[in-house]
Amino acid sequence: MGAVTKRITLDELRQLAARARGNIDKIYLHWSASNYHQFFSDYHLNIDNDGAVMATTDDLTEYKAHTWRRNSRAIGIALACCVDAVAYADGRIDFGNVPPTELQIDSMAKVVAVLCEELGLDINADTVMTHAEAADLDDYGPATTFERWDLWKLPDVPGDGELKPGGQVIRGKAIWWHNNW
């Protein structure tokens, strides 16, 4: 399918993931630093502001350049948002005029739950991580140079609404979805 972007359902995603089982070890979560409705073929899946899942491939094992030195045997998923987001060294974040929506965050968690179930992966920080978490491991994230801080922090909604580590928010929701289908 190449760079053609197609809206898919979670059932269709299950089918794609089942075909990729045994060939994927990691899932990396991003935002695209773009506007809503703007999708990029660097990611296998893009999620729009209304939670719609957009696939840029019909083969989840296709190599995509989404995370520096971490693209082999990996799936990249991006929220279409945060075109003008700014992070500050003191931990404050301004998501700008195109913030991640509650629908996007929840949809990403559902996507992670489906993928992990079909791929046979545990939902944990070793198999599912944000770009910020991966970048910190490789010395270009929020802990060092702030080059990549995608999903570093996210509002915990519908929880207390406070900013919390984004990976924990999404993995926590994904575990909930996995246990409550």
Regions of interest found by a model, annotated:
Residues 1-21, 82-181:
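Basic/polar, cationic surfaces and motifs that engage anionic cell-wall
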Residues 26, 74-76, 127-129:
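Structural preference for beta-strand elements that scaffold enzyme active sites
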Residues 46-103:
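Peptidoglycan-targeting cell-wall enzymes and recognition modules
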Residues 1-71, 179:
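N-terminal catalytic cores of peptidoglycan-degrading enzymes
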